[in-house]
Amino acid sequence: MGVVRSLLLFVVAAVTEIGGAWLVWQGVREHRGPVWVGLGIGFLAAYGFVATLQPDAHFGRILAAYGGVFVAGSLLWGVAVDGFRPDRYDLAGAAICLLGVAVIMYARRV
């Protein structure tokens, strides 16, 4: 159950951080206004709290592993929201990052 909870928290973290950054981008770069920016800031703040819910107690490990989730999640967000089409190098890079997440977070430690 710990791994499932951790993975779900990584997904929530990705949605809050990537979504927050996207909202700020929309507010500033796409001129959608301060409400979008404010919502984005709120989502980004929520991301900071979500990370604290991870079962592992080591901040550095959590953030290092989340970096890989962020890479893959950003590509997925681009596909779903912005019509981005990743090439094979994007996909290979994301796969390598997710492998890193698995090693950092879930490898059996002795």
From Swiss-Prot:
<keyword id="KW-0812">Transmembrane</keyword>
<keyword id="KW-1133">Transmembrane helix</keyword>
<keyword id="KW-1003">Cell membrane</keyword>
<keyword id="KW-0472">Membrane</keyword>
<feature type="transmembrane region" description="Helical">
    <location>
        <begin position="62"/>
        <end position="82"/>
    </location>
</feature>
<dbReference type="Pfam" id="PF02694">
    <property type="entry name" value="UPF0060"/>
</dbReference>
<comment type="similarity">
    <text>Belongs to the UPF0060 family.</text>
</comment>
<dbReference type="GO" id="GO:0005886">
    <property type="term" value="C:plasma membrane"/>
</dbReference>
<feature type="transmembrane region" description="Helical">
    <location>
        <begin position="33"/>
        <end position="53"/>
    </location>
</feature>
<protein>
    <recommendedName>
        <fullName>UPF0060 membrane protein Francci3_2786</fullName>
    </recommendedName>
</protein>
<dbReference type="InterPro" id="IPR003844">
    <property type="entry name" value="UPF0060"/>
</dbReference>
<feature type="transmembrane region" description="Helical">
    <location>
        <begin position="8"/>
        <end position="28"/>
    </location>
</feature>
<feature type="transmembrane region" description="Helical">
    <location>
        <begin position="87"/>
        <end position="107"/>
    </location>
</feature>
